[in-house]
Amino acid sequence: MMRGAAPTGVVSVMVLMILVLLKQIESASANGSSLGLPPRKFCNIYQGSWVYDKSYPLYDSKNCPFIERQFNCKSNGRPDSEYLKYRWQPSGCNLPRFNGLDFLGRIMKGKKLMFVGDSLSLNQWQSLTCLLHNAAPKANSTSTRSPSGLSVFSFPAYNSSIMFSRNAFLVDIVGAPPKRVMKLDSISSGSLWKTADVLVFNSWHWWLHTDRKQPWDAIMSGNVTVKDMDRLVAYEKAMMTWAKWIDQNIDPSKTKVFFQGISPDHGRAREWSKQGGKGSCIGETKPIMGSSYLAGPHAAEMVVAKVIKTMKNQARLMDVTLMSQLRKDGHPSVYGFGGHRMADCSHWCLSGVPDSWNQLLYSELFHS
């Protein structure tokens, strides 16, 4: 042994100590404590603000072949790009940066994740498929869509599937026009939900549709059938049915259940600006800075929170409403499906805001 050289055993111990230290640093970075912030479990990741980050977006939309035309704003001619450069920053901690390989190889290996809801769930599902494709571009993947409305994106190497089931109301609609009845007390599609290891539900926007866009002709609550009722009341009744179904049919030790909070639209500028007038999301290129929204909490958001509190095995509320309210710039506007004929202030551009929703979902699963 050379003079001054440490014994082999000592070197091994030192190497082990360094590896442990690096692991602690990595863990600290993930939950924010490396910056003196409290651990993730003491932090509300849904309270925060948008900060400019030149490393964003997390993927280039032109490299994701799965994006539907209505969400592909850059391909549809949107000229500005600053809206892509904002990252969600919780007030009291840091989020782990989305790691697609960790998501596939550890969190979701051998498992199925299912988004259940309307086109906002489609928005989030497509975002996640793009994030994962970007992380593993050479991994073999398959994408299928059945007539029943189930879309499946699979990674055979990881035995993992990311699914989307189109179901805008969660409760049943039976019959054919002009006798279609929405049954607020009935769920018959739940057998499909039981096949997933992670469920992410969403429902709201279609509850506001009227006239020809309304996919039902009457509403049944209990034994009473009416032509119409207050939509927020109907929504709460349906969400209570959903909550009871989850409590009775889902084992929380085997399946994680999330409810994606209400995704807002930005069709009325007066909701975020006192000088808003009759404006909308058209021409908006920057988010609202800070952590407050002029119009305040969303009524449907409060209904969802109320319903979840009644559950025996509470679903986790992904309360994305405020963070999304602050992103008046993130919609397709006139660069969505149909072009300049109609402004879309409800859905979101991809890349864009749904990527941050999925980063929050990743954080929830990362720490669970």
Swiss-Prot record:
Intervals of motif DCXHWCLPGXXDXWN motif: 344-358
Q: How does it sit in the membrane?
A: Single-pass type II membrane protein
- A cellular-component GO term for this protein: membrane
Give the residue interval(s) assigned to the motif GDS motif.
117-119
Q: Which key words are in the record? A: Membrane, Signal-anchor, Transmembrane, Transmembrane helix
Q: Where in the cell is it found?
A: Membrane
Q: Hey, which family's this protein in?
A: Belongs to the PC-esterase family. TBL subfamily.
**More details:** Contains 2 motifs that are conserved in esterases, but it is unlikely that this protein belongs to the catalytically active pectin esterases.
Name of protein: Protein trichome birefringence-like 43
- Which gene is this protein's source? TBL43
